[in-house]
């Protein structure tokens, strides 16, 4: 097996409450554990998490197995509230174009023998790298914005050393159609989980004497379906609902709604660290993922890291009935699905599951066993094998 040096290029903010940075850090860590020499290049961005550790390995609860380098960057986010949106988008476009070119030049100067790994969110960098015939893995988590399609088409046409990766089958199909990439060349790999972090978590027991605790972990942005969950909580007052995640305005809105409606059975805990999350999973009786079915991204392209953490935690899961979820789990076998955006159906499924201890245990066991298939290490191993199909030396 050839051991590659890998440089991961990212434009994300670190540390961050966003799941994309958790995925990036875990991928870098898993590649390093596999034997690759890994460097992560990230921009300097203004940190929005109060009191967050500046030690990224501590923040993401990972051992130090790879190197992280901060690349100079002009963070325009502070201007967003003070200038018209059209002006901000134009400035941001120019800023991103200049920085991504600078990032590639920084890579060439310091790491030009490395295989590049990056998400699809760097269109200018991807286009420039393709012209230089540098080998690269491009991981797609959604379809590129229409304004950048030409950059991606040209990039994959220019370079035979670009390896496309998609997190769902439907995303791979759309990438193939729109970008003109052979479907068979696209590696389909969903997200993953650090199994070891949940090793001590036990399968849910059949004891239903205590007050039931339903837990949601994740972002509070509209397409995550937290509004549906809150609606269910208003009806099911005999059940505790714990919501973990969210910062700033998103969290403030939910807090205001909770207070206005006197929802004493809703506990808003805000953002919690990767180190603490397994403990909160352990305290839950049921975990919930109520994503909307009104957006293409959630219905076809989503492979949320939280789903795999839920699976590894050994707790029964209720989730929106989305094609992207069905790619991983089977209804009534390893998960209980409800009609997306339908609070009545969600309420019925909560009542059904909470009244059936045997079903709770069945779903928990099956999903936890299936989670072993989706470890970060297994994901990296599949990438390593796929690389061999391409002449990138």
Model-derived regions: residue spans:
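Glycosyltransferase donor-sugar binding loop
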Residues: 44-46, 217, 240-254
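Conserved donor-binding/catalytic core segment of Leloir-type glycosyltransferases
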Residues: 7-9, 165, 207-233, 241-242
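N-terminal subdomain of nucleotide-sugar transferases
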Residues: 1-62, 110-111, 134, 163, ...
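Conserved acidic donor-binding segment of nucleotide-sugar-dependent glycosyltransferases
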Residues: 331-343, 352-357
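Nucleotide-activated donor-binding/catalytic signature segment of Leloir-type glycosyltransferases, i.e.
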Residues: 252-279
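Short hydrophobic beta-strand element within catalytic cores of glycosyltransferases
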Residues: 287-289, 309-312, 316-319
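A short, well-ordered alpha-helix in the C-terminal region of glycosyltransferases
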Residues: 345, 352, 359-373, 385
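Carbohydrate-associated surface elements
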Residues: 170, 192
């Amino acid at each position: 097996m050839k051991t590659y040096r890998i440089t991961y290029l990212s434009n994300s903010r670190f540390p961050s409450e966003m799941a994309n940075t958790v995925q990036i850090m875990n991928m870098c860590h898993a590649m390093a554990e596999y034997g690759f020499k890994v460097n992560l290049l990230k921009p300097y961005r203004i940190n929005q998490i109060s009191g967050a550790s500046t030690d990224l390995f501590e923040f993401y609860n990972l051992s130090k197995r790879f190197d992280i380098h901060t690349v100079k960057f002009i963070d325009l986010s502070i201007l967003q509230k003070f200038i018209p949106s059209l002006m901000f988008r134009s400035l941001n476009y120019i800023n991103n174009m200049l920085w991504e070119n600078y990032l590639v030049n920084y890579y060439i100067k310091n790491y030009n023998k490395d295989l590049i790994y990056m998400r699809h969110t760097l269109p200018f960098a991807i286009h420039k790298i393709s012209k230089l015939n540098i080998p690269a893995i491009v991981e797609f988590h959604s379809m590129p914005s229409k304004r950048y399609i030409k950059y991606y088409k040209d990039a994959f046409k220019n370079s035979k050393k670009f390896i496309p990766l998609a997190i769902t089958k439907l995303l791979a199909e759309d990438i193939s159609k729109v970008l003109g990439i052979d479907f068979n060349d696209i590696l389909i790999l969903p997200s993953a989980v650090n199994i070891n972090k949940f090793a001590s978590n036990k399968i849910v027991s059949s004891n239903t004497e205590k007050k039931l605790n339903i837990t949601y972990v994740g972002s509070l942005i509209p397409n995550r379906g937290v509004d549906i969950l809150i609606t269910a909580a208003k009806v099911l007052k005999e059940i505790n609902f714990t919501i973990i995640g969210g910062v700033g305005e998103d969290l403030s809105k939910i807090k205001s709604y909770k207070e206005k409606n006197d929802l004493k059975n809703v506990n808003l805990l805000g953002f919690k660290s990767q180190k603490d999350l397994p403990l909160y999973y352990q305290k839950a009786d049921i975990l919930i993922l109520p994503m909307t079915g009104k957006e293409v991204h959630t219905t076809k392209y989503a492979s949320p890291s939280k789903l795999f953490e839920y699976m590894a935690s050994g707790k029964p899961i209720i989730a929106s009935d989305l094609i992207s979820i069905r790619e991983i789990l089977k209804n009534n076998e390893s998960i209980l699905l409800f009609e997306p955006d339908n609070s009545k159906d969600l309420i019925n499924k909560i009542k059904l599951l909470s009244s059936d201890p045997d079903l709770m245990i069945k779903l928990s066991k099956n999903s936890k066993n299936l989670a072993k298939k989706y470890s970060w290490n297994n994901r990296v191993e599949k990438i390593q094998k796929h690389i061999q199909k391409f002449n990138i030396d």
